[in-house]
């Protein structure tokens, strides 16, 4: 995978941009945390929301994040999995790009029942700010779970459980962002790119 013109190397939660100044190469470093925006009291009072949209809006930042996620997948697990299970809806964007680049199937984990046809399994779970449900179409195969943020681990554990109920084998999970101060727990191995 190649990055758009103007970027060179990235990794370890930082972006490195190549610039030309008097025919000498210089690298400008930008931390992902400088790009991600925080919004207090969203979606409810007392929650500080991390907004990854500034990364998604910029093709260089987005492609750098995708590349860092690819590196984590290669480091974390063998390439013998069938699907990337993307959690609605913020996992859909980068997760679908990863599935395309890795030539893997895309498995949708929907947050509201009734959005998937055919035989499904669903589970209720608790979020940091309320209750939710998750639903998946039944099937078979090995699944890498992808969501944008790992907070307490409740959503990811629900994804693990509903996939198992649906006949799949969850083999790991990947997150662009992990909120380590919330001490997330998950019953399967996981990796993250940016740690708070």
Label each residue range with its predicted role.
Residues 9, 28-29, 34, 157-196:
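PRPP-dependent phosphoribosyltransferase catalytic core
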Residues 13-80, 139:
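Active-site-facing substrate-recognition patch
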Residues 79-88:
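Short glycine-rich phosphate-binding loop at a beta-alpha junction
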Residues 82, 141, 171:
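Conserved acidic residues
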Residues 93-102:
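Short Gly/Thr/Asp-enriched flexible loops that form oxyanion-binding sites at enzyme active sites
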Residues 104-144:
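Short, glycine/charge-rich flexible loops or terminal/linker lids adjacent to PRPP-binding catalytic cores
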Residues 147-160:
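Acidic, divalent-metal-coordinating active-site segment for phosphoryl/phosphodiester hydrolysis
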């Amino acid at each position: 995978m190649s990055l758009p013109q103007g970027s060179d190397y990235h990794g370890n939660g930082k972006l490195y941009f190549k610039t030309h100044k008097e025919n000498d190469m210089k690298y400008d470093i930008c931390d992902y945390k400088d790009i991600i925006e925080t919004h207090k009291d969203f979606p409810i009072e007392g929650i500080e929301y991390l907004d990854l949209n500034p990364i998604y809006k910029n093709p260089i930042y987005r492609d750098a994040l995708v590349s860092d996620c690819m590196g984590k997948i290669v480091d974390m697990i063998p390439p013998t999995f069938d699907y990337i299970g993307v959690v609605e809806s913020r996992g859909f964007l980068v997760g679908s790009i990863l599935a395309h680049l890795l030539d893997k199937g895309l498995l949708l984990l929907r947050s509201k029942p009734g959005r998937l046809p055919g035989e499904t399994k669903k589970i209720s779970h608790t979020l940091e700010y309320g209750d939710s449900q998750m639903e998946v179409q039944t099937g078979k195969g090995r699944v890498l779970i992808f969501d944008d943020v790992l907070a307490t681990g409740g959503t990811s554990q629900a994804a693990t459980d509903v996939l198992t109920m649906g006949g799949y084998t969850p083999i790991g999970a990947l997150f662009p962002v992990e909120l380590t101060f919330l001490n997330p727990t998950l019953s399967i191995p996981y990796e993250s790119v940016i740690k708070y």
